[in-house]
Amino acid sequence: MKNVLPPFIEIYRALIATPSISATEESLDQSNASLITLLAGWFSDLGFNVEVQPVPGTRNKFNMLASTGHGAGGLLLTGHTDTVPFDDGRWTRDPFTLTEHDNKLYGLGTADMKGFFAFILDALRDVDVTKLKKPLYILATADEETSMAGARYFSETTALRPDCAIIGEPTSLQPIRAHKGHISNVVRVLGQSGHSSDPARGVNAIELMHDAIGHIMQLRDSLKARYHYEAFTVPYPTLNLGHIHGGDASNRICACCELHMDIRPLPGMTLNDLNGLLNDALAPVSERWPGRLTVAELHPPIPGYECPPDHQLVEVVEKLLGTKTDVVNYCTEAPFMQTLCPTLVLGPGSINQAHQPDEYLETRFIKPTRELITQVVHHFCWH
């Protein structure tokens, strides 16, 4: 059965040629059903049992779980099937045609991160999966680039408890054991419109927001002073004011003002605690102007994540790669997988190429990635 698998580069080519864009804007959002069908067929050909799982609350999106072996524990290799949208005017190549040039593989998803599944399939084509002593699971998730709905749903519904998991995000084969979380909120102030010639007849939402921003900046300074994790390049929680809009005319008292902001918490900081700190910071404004200020989520929050540095997974991977694990400021699906088992983020390609025009993966990653997957499968599923 295994000899029916296409060559590595043809698997890669087929994955890139199958669009699976995730976007909050409905006109850009795409189902990943075709890509899931491709993966399900290939893993079935390798002898895996394959389950396709609809993801609730999405626009026709699916997870795929391929499993082989029996018993408890084992290894989970996982990644997301979706990509970000692309700016056609900034790409010099067809995003959906895998192009090899100057020791690089170009295409949307080559690094982030559909290509990871080509590496898994290629590494397993010569493995007799019926002889594994522990289970091997391959998970392909949906909607990582927007809501992380696939990983959230899987982690909430699965009974699986592998020994460990590896998420193949592009880390330049540098193992990552911790990252910050992400909370994005909209602060909305409702004023009362009126003619600017008589300020007393209205409530200016921009002025109230100015007061609110002052308190938010105090919270930012407090987070920086109170919380530290020196392994991060930015060793404290960050708070960013990303977008503000209010009013519609210079001669009209502003009736509504909105601020979009985010906080990136350190591992160990709970989302409930952070929301409480934000509400406490804004309490003076709310008390002075009852009913005029609200805070709501822009996107589902992502907690910070950390894999214990002394876990066997960390020790094994550090030994195989000859390098220490690191921490990063960006987010992945790791917090959700970590609820099931100790998890590392580790994959080919550079995060610097993610979400960029002319995205590419350097071919120098091909051999070591295939070897790494072979080694971790052997260690965690054969011993």
UniProtKB/Swiss-Prot annotation:
GO MF, one example: zinc ion binding
InterPro entries with a match to the protein in the record: AcOrn-deacetyl, ArgE/DapE_CS, Bact_exopeptidase_dim_dom, Peptidase_M20, Peptidase_M20_dimer, Peptidase_M20A
GO-annotated cellular components: cytoplasm
Subcellular location: Cytoplasm
Stated family: Belongs to the peptidase M20A family. ArgE subfamily.
Subunit field text: Homodimer.
Protein name as catalogued: Acetylornithine deacetylase
Organism: Salmonella paratyphi B (strain ATCC BAA-1250 / SPB7)
Source organism phylogeny: Bacteria, Pseudomonadati, Pseudomonadota, Gammaproteobacteria, Enterobacterales
Gene name linked to the record: argE
